[in-house]
Amino acid sequence: MSAIPEPRIIENDDGSKTVISFKIQDGKKYKVTQKVKEITVTEKVNKNIALRRNWKKYGADKGAAPGPDISTTQLGEELELDLSPNWKEMEEEKAKEKAANSTQKVITCRICGGAHFTMHCPYKDTLGKKPTTSAGLDPAIGGGDMSAQGGSGSGRYVPPSLRAGARDPSSNAYQDQRERDDAKTIRLTQVNELADEEVLKRELLFPFGEIPRVFVVKNPETGRSRGVAYVTFQTEEIAAQALKLLEGRGFMNFMLHAEWSKPKPKKEE
């Protein structure tokens, strides 16, 4: 078998090079033609940075090539320093926004549990006023006397639903509240098993404001998600918007399917 010729390099008119080489594989000689174009990339850095790169290394890195060596150098997190003339004002605005958000989260209605004051609750006429006691607390929570909690003052435990002043879950008020929740609740299927309530709130539902309730259906035996989640929004309008945007959307390598938790009645034309 003849010897392999030396590689040839041909300069092209467009600035590229054609490299012709030969190789022997499985007893056969092959000709390999490669077209190579050299590109020079110029990096613009600060003058002082360029000077520091030329400093001579010492100690364990004496005589080493430029650049950090992972065996002797530990790289830290890269931080961006934003020097703005009005940085104090920006920090004050961020602090005010954070304080306002924390205040909104603290406010909770005692009637429906919404993020508003009890006196402004839109459901107070439907759900009724909470019974008042001498301490001004709900007897179901434990602010009343023993007769309100135990029924006879004997000290026996009485479930909250059977205590004095508690509302019957089968009453019209509870049914109305349940229907209102269903009207603004959507059902998500084909949800990734790794997505729990916090992941859904943080990475999927954040554009829709505060989410009152997220529930992921899990297998009671294994504790793993069944790929189904129920999401309750603040209003029915927001729920309708979320339904439109989440239907067919990709999330964690799965295509979501969104529908109402309770089918809507068809409007008569």
From Swiss-Prot:
InterPro entries: eIF3_g, eIF3g_N, eIF3G_RRM, Nucleotide-bd_a/b_plait_sf, RBD_domain_sf, RRM_dom. Residues 184-263 form the RRM domain. Pfam families: eIF3g, RRM_1. It comes from the Eukaryota. Residues 140-181 are annotated as: Disordered. It is found in: Cytoplasm. Residues 141-154 have a biased composition (Gly residues). The modification Phosphoserine is found at S161. GO terms for molecular function: RNA binding; translation initiation factor activity. The keyword Cytoplasm applies. GO terms for cellular component: eukaryotic 43S preinitiation complex; eukaryotic 48S preinitiation complex; eukaryotic translation initiation factor 3 complex. GO terms for biological process: formation of cytoplasmic translation initiation complex. Its main location: cytoplasm. Keywords: Cytoplasm, Initiation factor, Phosphoprotein, Protein biosynthesis, RNA-binding. Component of the eukaryotic translation initiation factor 3 (eIF-3) complex. RNA-binding component of the eukaryotic translation initiation factor 3 (eIF-3) complex, which is involved in protein synthesis of a specialized repertoire of mRNAs and, together with other initiation factors, stimulates binding of mRNA and methionyl-tRNAi to the 40S ribosome. The eIF-3 complex specifically targets and initiates translation of a subset of mRNAs involved in cell proliferation. This subunit can bind 18S rRNA. Belongs to the eIF-3 subunit G family. This is Eukaryotic translation initiation factor 3 subunit G. It comes from Kluyveromyces lactis (strain ATCC 8585 / CBS 2359 / DSM 70799 / NBRC 1267 / NRRL Y-1140 / WM37). The lineage of its organism: Eukaryota, Fungi, Dikarya, Ascomycota, Saccharomycotina.
